[in-house]
From Swiss-Prot:
<dbReference type="InterPro" id="IPR009081">
    <property type="entry name" value="PP-bd_ACP"/>
</dbReference>
<feature type="binding site">
    <location>
        <begin position="571"/>
        <end position="573"/>
    </location>
    <ligand>
        <name>NADP(+)</name>
    </ligand>
</feature>
<feature type="site" description="Essential for catalytic activity">
    <location>
        <position position="142"/>
    </location>
</feature>
<dbReference type="InterPro" id="IPR001555">
    <property type="entry name" value="GART_AS"/>
</dbReference>
<dbReference type="GO" id="GO:0004029">
    <property type="term" value="F:aldehyde dehydrogenase (NAD+) activity"/>
</dbReference>
<dbReference type="InterPro" id="IPR036736">
    <property type="entry name" value="ACP-like_sf"/>
</dbReference>
<dbReference type="InterPro" id="IPR029510">
    <property type="entry name" value="Ald_DH_CS_GLU"/>
</dbReference>
<dbReference type="InterPro" id="IPR016161">
    <property type="entry name" value="Ald_DH/histidinol_DH"/>
</dbReference>
<dbReference type="InterPro" id="IPR015590">
    <property type="entry name" value="Aldehyde_DH_dom"/>
</dbReference>
<comment type="similarity">
    <text>In the C-terminal section; belongs to the aldehyde dehydrogenase family. ALDH1L subfamily.</text>
</comment>
<dbReference type="Pfam" id="PF00171">
    <property type="entry name" value="Aldedh"/>
</dbReference>
<feature type="active site" description="Proton donor">
    <location>
        <position position="106"/>
    </location>
</feature>
<dbReference type="InterPro" id="IPR011034">
    <property type="entry name" value="Formyl_transferase-like_C_sf"/>
</dbReference>
<feature type="active site" description="Proton donor">
    <location>
        <position position="707"/>
    </location>
</feature>
<dbReference type="InterPro" id="IPR036477">
    <property type="entry name" value="Formyl_transf_N_sf"/>
</dbReference>
<keyword id="KW-0521">NADP</keyword>
<feature type="binding site">
    <location>
        <begin position="630"/>
        <end position="635"/>
    </location>
    <ligand>
        <name>NADP(+)</name>
    </ligand>
</feature>
Length: 902
């Protein structure tokens, strides 16, 4: 189609570019005249492409079209006019001229907010839904028939800039292109605008952007954000006009400490605090503004209002002087109307506009090795000298957010360079433990030290809890929209996937996990877990509940599902990353902050995870990782008054101690995933080949270091001998070796103390009369390797029949053919109830057994088949509470009932 593009701005330019990509012929571009010698982006692009560009200062005089302007337009013979953003009045002779007429982009859901300040009014009136309309132009003001509309959620702290950049700009470009496509195909609708809900809102200008303080805080917040950045909501303090930017609304809660600032007309003094300027409405609620701009254009952080001028000017190095001159040249290119850029030259007073801010930020990024400034930084340093000082401080790392500094341990292993953090991770930074205390973490494959790891002390634990508490109560995490929190968790999962091979390699050398298993399960399921729970972030919701009415009044009761606060998580060594993911993903999804203690013997993937969390944009203090002794860290977290929840996976005796400490300290919420002795019942009518294969997996998976491992196999007598024979044959085929070798089936046990316990466990089994059919001893090679082991003739009173080995030890007992209730009684005769399994082709038998088994998980004709969507957790002394699935969220949420009478 032959199209005339009429408009201006970056938005107009992007629509123009996309129309060319679609194959349309742009016959002409009509834009505004150059300003201070600078062409509008739309016109500049079209001129480069050789498209005819017209820069009429006006199309009409005294309400009448200028004939020569109209003739120049008509000569192009356009079939459609596209007006992506146009500040000029276009005569109807031009609007109606093309075959298909004209379409216009408008940034509101028409008929609401007609007029030139639609985005401002969407926010000022507190609309929950925003969006844009592409409509057919007519002789009214934004009254033409609707072609298409797109909606978006308006976030509580959205400003004109944020909603524009997040949705109205990118989706608006797509919407304009789609509208043209529909017209070209002959499918474009014409829907009459409804009269109901129609509004026309006047244009927002500086003179009518003065704040009215006699209204609720939320209305003041909406007014400020609705005028952010243009024209800027303002008030007068000490005979000086102050303009406010970056408002956030805080409902309820005590006001923070701060220095009072009297504001004429306000219900109470504002407070200058470390987080910004706290303002109050006439309802006593509060809002906080981040930045203040003075009449001369200078912007400062609101928290700095009472502070003295910046410290003495920096002395620039020779290299920094070169950067300064390059930036001076960039200012000169932007401010073409200024003959010389002096140190005192003010960017905005010299004629710069908001579009020039974007350009300057990009120029600095190009000249300063990717240094990323924000638009606000330009407003806060408007004079050239101030701007250079700010840029140099950023380049030196003296200003802005603290840079993440990591003292990596680097290893050339598994055909890659592995970079491993080894310090405590507290409040978004890696740091040494108090006193520089550390310990060696050991590679179980050969018994050598991988690296020194910081050993957390009491003061470190308290510092981490304080950081988590601050992040929860005052940080961005607690204010964040749940959907935005989900985006961060998705990003974290993506980064874990990008580093999957590195994480799996670290897991292999630190825990002994076979690399191929680490890729699929240890790391792969961790990624799946974060993705699954990221999707839950914006789906946590309460209920409305019918209650008896207090007649003649009425009542409404609803529930809120709220995060608990600071959560302590203590995880075991068998799946170091996966156990972190199972608990932490649900915890973060619910909106909590976390202090996590990895197992002392396997801390490295947790620390690598901490690094990735920073790169994903998780705010500081939300995640804290403390390697060290469980007796110190776990106990302190259980006792700490600011920790409100403990999630623990580990042994039953330690779980009991944690539960006791949580009760005595502050009655913390607790979830426990403890020991197991999971029974696997195999009936004679099973698929024996599958039962042998899955039976081996149930015991030897991950070297037996598996909380749900089948701790005891009950075999129906008629298949006992054949089953044992086949299992022994298959075990002999298993390759024991280096976990990084892709052909290895069975790697080393996790650590030396565990290996010694396995040796002792098997010696006890032999002493009590168990028949050691295979294995039972350490492999004669360096490292902590233990042979896959098989015991038969194990009777119910034996130690190995009751206690879990947590290793590759298969315990086999017989039961009489057909004695279903008898074997169920034996299987349930345990204080544990984590998992269980049954193999049979008889569906009635399978359902009966699954009903009667006293375990949190029952596998039928399979084993180890866990999934991120299925709840996981035990009965009896295997603990309580669930990991995974929707139920896991309950462990990290509290329910509040709210009853209203009206």
């Amino acid at each position: 189609m032959k199209i005339a593009v009429i408009g201006q701005s970056l938005f107009g330019r992007e629509v123009y570019r996309e129309l060319l990509k679609e194959g349309h012929q742009v016959v002409g571009v009509f834009t505004i005249p150059d300003k201070n010698g600078k062409a509008d982006p739309l016109g500049a692009d079209a001129e480069k492409d050789g498209i005819p560009v017209f820069k009429f200062p006006r199309w009409r005089v005294k309400g009448q079209a200028i004939p020569e302007v109209v003739e120049k337009y008509k000569a192009l013979e356009a079939e459609l006019n596209v007006l992506p953003f146009c500040s000029q009045f276009i005569p109807m002779e031009v609007i109606d001229c093309p075959k298909h007429g004209s379409i216009i982009y408008h940034p509101s859901i028409l008929p609401r907010h007609r007029g030139a300040s639609a985005i401002n009014w969407t926010l000022m009136q507190g609309d929950k839904i925003g969006g844009f309309t592409v409509f057919w132009a007519d002789d009214g003001l934004d009254t033409g028939d609707i072609l298409l509309q797109r909606q978006c959620e308006v976030l509580p702290d959205d400003t004109v800039n944020t909603i524009y950049n997040r949705f109205l700009f990118p989706e608006g470009v797509k919407g304009m292109v789609e509208a043209v496509r529909l017209i070209a195909e002959g499918n474009a609708p014409r829907i009459k605008q409804p009269t109901e809900g129609a509004t026309y809102d006047p244009m927002q200008k500086k003179e009518n952007a003065k704040i009215n303080w006699d209204q609720p805080a939320e209305d003041i917040h909406n007014f400020i954000r609705g005028n952010d950045k243009v024209p800027g909501a303002w008030t007068v303090v000490d005979d000086q006009q102050l303009t406010f930017f970056g408002s956030s609304f805080t409902r309820n809660g005590p006001a923070p400490d701060g220095q009072p600032l009297e504001i004429p007309g306000a219900s109470r003094p504002a407070l200058v605090t470390k987080t910004g300027l706290v303002l109050f409405g006439n309802d006593g609620e509060r809002l906080t503004v981040k930045n203040i701009q003075f009449e001369d254009g200078k912007m400062i952080p609101a928290s700095q209002y009472f502070k003295t001028a910046d410290s003495a000017a920096l002395q620039l190095s020779e290299e920094e002087q070169k950067v300064s001159e390059e930036i001076r040249a960039a200012w000169r290119r932007i401010l073409t109307n200024v003959s010389e850029i002096e140190d005192s030259t003010d960017f905005f007073k010299a004629g710069a506009a908001s579009m020039d801010v974007v350009r300057l930020v990009e120029e600095v990024k190009l000249k300063c090795n990717g240094l990323q400034l924000q638009n606000e930084d330009v407003y806060m340093a408007t004079k050239f000298e101030e701007f250079i000082q700010m840029v140099v401080r950023r380049m030196r790392g003296e200003d802005g957010e603290e840079e993440l500094v990591i003292d990596y341990v680097e290893k050339e292993i598994n055909n890659m360079t592995v970079k491993i953090p080894h310090q405590l991770f507290i409040n978004g930074q890696f740091m040494d433990a108090e006193g520089g205390k550390s310990y060696d973490t050991i590679n179980p494959t050969d018994g050598t030290a991988i690296c020194k790891v910081s050993l957390a002390q009491i003061s470190d634990i308290d510092r981490a809890v304080a950081a988590a508490k601050e992040a929860f109560e005052n940080g961005e995490w607690g204010k964040m929209n749940p959907r935005d929190r989900g985006r961060l968790l998705y990003r974290l999962a993506d980064l874990m996937e990008e580093h999957q091979e590195e994480l799996a390699t670290i897991e292999s050398i630190d825990s002994g996990a076979v690399y191929t298993l680490a890729l699929k399960t240890h790391v792969g399921m961790s990624i799946q877990t974060f993705r699954y729970f990221a999707g839950w972030c914006d789906k946590i919701q309460g209920r409305t509940i019918p209650i008896n009415q207090a007649r003649p009044n009425r009542n409404l009761t609803f529930t809120r599902r709220e995060p608990i606060g600071v959560c302590g998580i203590v995880i075991p060594w068998n799946y170091p990353l996966m156990m972190l993911a199972w608990k932490t993903a649900a915890c973060l999804t619910a909106g909590n902050t976390v202090v996590l203690k990895p197992a002392q013997v396997t801390p490295l993937t947790a620390l690598k995870f901490a690094e990735l969390s920073v790169k994903a944009g998780i705010p500081k203090g939300v995640i804290n990782i403390l390697p060290g002794a469980g007796s110190l860290i776990g106990q302190r977290l259980s006792d700490h008054p600011d920790v409100r929840k403990i999630g623990f996976t580990g042994s039953t005796p330690i779980g009991k101690q944690i539960m006791k400490s949580c009760a005595v300290s502050n009655v913390k919420k607790v979830s426990l995933e403890l020991g197991g002795k999971s029974p696997l019942i195999i009936f004679h009518d099973c698929d024996l080949d599958k039962a042998v294969r899955m039976g081996m997996s149930s015991v030897f998976f991950n070297k037996g270091e598996n909380c749900i491992a089948a701790g005891r196999l009950f075999l129906e007598e008629s298949i006992h001998d054949e089953f044992v024979k086949r299992v022994v044959e298959e075990v002999k085929k298993m390759k024991i070796g280096d976990p990084l070798d892709r052909s290895t089936d069975h790697g080393p046990q996790n650590h030396k103390a565990h290996l010694d316990k396995l040796i002792e466990y098997c010696q006890t089994g032999v002493k009590e009369g168990g028949k050691l059919v295979y294995g039972g001893k350490q492999v004669e090679r360096p490292g902590f390797f233990f042979e896959p082991t098989i015991f038969t003739d194990v009777t119910d009173e034996m130690f190995i029949a009751k206690e879990e080995s947590f290793g590759p030890v298969m315990i086999i007992s017989k039961f009489n053919d057909g004695d279903i209730d008898g074997v169920l009684k034996r299987a349930n005769d345990s204080e544990f109830g984590l998992a269980s399994g049954v193999f049979t082709k008889d569906i009635n038998k399978a359902l009966y057994v699954s009903e009667k088994l006293q375990a949190g998980t029952v596998f039928v004709n399979t084993y180890n088949k866990t999934d991120v969507a299925a709840p996981f957790g035990g009965f009896k002394q295997s603990g309580f509470g669930k990991d995974l699935g929707e139920e896991a969220l309950n462990e990290y949420l509290k329910t509040k009932a709210v009853t209203i009478e009206y």
